[in-house]
Curated annotation (Swiss-Prot):
Primary location recorded for the protein, binned into one broad class: membrane
Extracellular side: 31-223
Location in or out of the cell: Membrane
GO molecular function, one term: identical protein binding
Biological process (GO), any one: lymph node development
Disulfide bonds: C43-C58, C59-C72, C62-C80, C83-C98, C101-C116, C104-C124, C126-C132, C139-C150, C142-C169, C172-C187
Organism whose genome encodes this protein: Mus musculus (Mouse)
Assembly mode: Self-associates; dimerization and trimerization are promoted by lymphotoxin (LTA(3)). Associates with TRAF3. Associates with TRAF4. Associates with TRAF5.
Protein's UniProt name: Tumor necrosis factor receptor superfamily member 3
UniProt-listed Gene3D superfamilies: Tumor Necrosis Factor Receptor, subunit A, domain 2 (2.10.50.10)
Cellular component aspect of the GO annotation: Golgi apparatus; plasma membrane
Residues the record lists as Phosphoserine modifications: S315
Glycosylation sites: N40, N179
Length: 415
């Protein structure tokens, strides 16, 4: 719905004028002054007025420090008067008398803090060493405090809302401390060093506060590190000196072990092992140690002598000893002389020689093998036949073939 007159400039000008006239009309109405009649028995100001049922009017209350001297009527309001000495009224009232001031009773354990006036009663408190006993949130009398001393690290806890003298000591909460012995001791929070721009020197406990100190300067920390390094070096040097004085041989052995094989260098070659005295060398040089060998005559090789046969039978043992020798031993060969050289447990052959391996029963010859030598001109003794310990020239018996015993051949292989 449109209001052309209200939206027009003339309507906007009339608005403030109408509001001012309404305020004047309200102010011009007569204000209700007690005593005044009212229909619902409810006065306008409940704190400072009261309803008088005898006259069916609302009357004024007396202010603090006064009492009702004359009751109101339909034509007259309440008449108030100041309370006499040693009496008081603390609130707005319609009482006909004032309350009597009550002094602080020493017998009950009280002492006076502020005297009684017409608008306030005397203010009392318990004497030192005593505490209040409350009843309906009012201290009725005082009693001596119980001698319950809370030790450091604990605090007093009120367990009874009526009697605050019933205390119990409980441990302080984490982050709090208490360092006195008192029945009213309370735990306090630990000091926070970082808030004060300090560093913590010692942490707080339940019975002590946190200890703070100024932050150390960088120069002091550097000096401390240098001194600590020097102390450790001197301590290490002292320990080494004591160990050298008490155990010099052990220290020398340790130094020898450290210097024997430096890192990155090869260990020196080990000396050649000595020949075992219990197993003497069985190989003897077959050719002279010096001088060149004379060229062998052309033609088939001659029959091996008895020493050559014995040497060939002993060759497996010599070969086994050569396998056990160190690699360095094989390199120790005398150069510039032809022949067979024996060094330790090794046999070195220089020059052209023929080796007779002896007859092998049932064996086959290869294409590169030398021609078979003729059979020896002497027979081999029969198996089990007794003979002298020294070598002698055997004789062939009639009707027997030239051969070597099979057991002798197998015996050489077993060696």
């Amino acid at each position: 719905m449109r209001l052309p007159r209200a939206s027009s400039p003339c309507g906007l000008a009339w608005g403030p004028l109408l509001l001012g006239l309404s305020g004047l009309l309200v102010a011009s109405q007569p204000q209700l002054v007690p005593p005044y009649r009212i229909e619902n028995q409810t006065c306008w100001d409940q704190d400072k007025e009261y309803y008088e049922p005898m006259h069916d009017v609302c009357c004024s209350r007396c202010p603090p420090g006064e009492f009702v001297f004359a009751v109101c009527s339909r034509s007259q309001d309440t008449v108030c008067k100041t309370c006499p000495h040693n009496s008081y009224n603390e609130h707005w009232n319609h009482l006909s008398t004032c309350q009597l001031c009550r002094p602080c009773d020493i017998v009950l354990g009280f002492e006076e803090v502020a005297p009684c006036t017409s608008d306030r009663k005397a203010e009392c408190r318990c004497q030192p060493g005593m505490s209040c006993v409350y009843l309906d949130n009012e201290c009725v009398h005082c009693e001596e405090e119980r001698l319950v001393l809370c030790q450091p690290g604990t605090e007093a806890e009120v367990t009874d809302e009526i009697m605050d003298t019933d205390v119990n000591c409980v441990p302080c909460k984490p982050g709090h401390f208490q360092n006195t012995s008192s029945p009213r001791a309370r735990c306090q929070p630990h000091t926070r060093c970082e808030i004060q721009g300090l560093v913590e020197a010692a942490p707080g406990t339940s019975y002590s506060d946190t200890i703070c100190k100024n932050p150390p300067e960088p120069g002091a920390m550097l000096l401390l590190a240098i001194l600590l390094s020097l102390v450790l070096f001197l301590l290490f040097t002292t320990v080494l000196a004591c160990a050298w004085m008490r155990h010099p041989s052990l220290c020398r052995k340790l130094g020898t072990l450290l210097k024997r094989h430096p890192e990155g260098e090869e260990s020196p070659p080990c000396p050649a092992p000595r020949a075992d005295p219990h197993f003497p060398d069985l190989a003897e040089p077959l050719l002279p140690m010096s001088g060149d060998l004379s060229p062998s005559p052309a033609g088939p090789p001659t029959a091996p002598s008895l020493e050559e046969v014995v040497l060939q039978q002993q060759s497996p043992l010599v070969q086994a000893r050569e396998l056990e020798a160190e690699p360095g031993e094989h390199g120790q060969v005398a150069h510039g002389a032809n022949g067979i050289h024996v060094t330790g447990g090794s046999v070195t052959v220089t020059g052209n020689i023929y080796i007779y391996n002896g007859p092998v029963l049932g064996g086959t010859r290869g294409p590169g093998d030398p021609p078979a030598p003729p059979e020896p001109p002497y027979p081999t003794p029969e198996e089990g036949a007794p003979g002298p310990s020294e070598l002698s020239t055997p004789y062939q018996e009639d009707g027997k073939a030239w051969h070597l015993a099979e057991t002798e051949t197998l015996g050489c292989q077993d060696l």
